[in-house]
């Protein structure tokens, strides 16, 4: 199988077709949006993916302090695989739970704050790793926050970029209940 491969800021990118390695049997498009108020940016990634990563379909992480990270994964059997657009953000109220919150880029050791969970968010996610780019050093990242359900991610998930994206931690736990102050 061959798929379009490209990465860019925004909603589109110039792609080239490349052969995929097993077990990456599907073409896919990943849209990412990262917002740390008042700054927000989106990126697009077209690539070869394993069917296990395609099953993830979407993720939404509430990092707290009006910050979030969300992604949409759309896979198909054709070389050209257009992604789905982001819907508007849902309006949801705090639900009495909290998690550690971090959006750490360029470091795996970031200072934590409390992320107040909203709506159906009752789980805490903790993801850390390194992204290898054509820079003098790897880009480290550490993301913690509230999620509605635990994604089926593990350290063994392979993508076409296995040599460029190194997950070192994937944890999902129950959120803590806020104890009302007297």
From Swiss-Prot:
Expressed by the liver. Pfam families: PLA2_inh, UPAR_LY6. Disulfide bonds join 3-27, 6-13, 20-48, 54-75, 76-81, 99-124, 117-146, 150-172. Keywords: Disulfide bond, Glycoprotein, Phospholipase A2 inhibitor, Secreted. This is Phospholipase A2 inhibitor gamma subunit A. InterPro entries: CNF-like_PLA2_Inhibitor, LY6_UPA_recep-like, PLipase_A2-inh_b-type, PLipase_A2_inh_N, Snake_toxin-like_sf. One of its GO terms (cellular component) is extracellular region. Its main location: secreted. Heterotrimer of 2 subunits A and 1 subunit B. N-glycosylation is not important for activity, since deglycosylation does not change its PLA2 inhibitory activity. Glycans are attached at residue 157. It comes from the Eukaryota. Strongly inhibits its own venom PLA2 and all other PLA2s tested including Elapid, Crotalid and Viperid venom PLA2s, as well as honeybee PLA2s. Belongs to the CNF-like-inhibitor family. One of its GO terms (molecular function) is phospholipase A2 inhibitor activity. It is found in: Secreted.
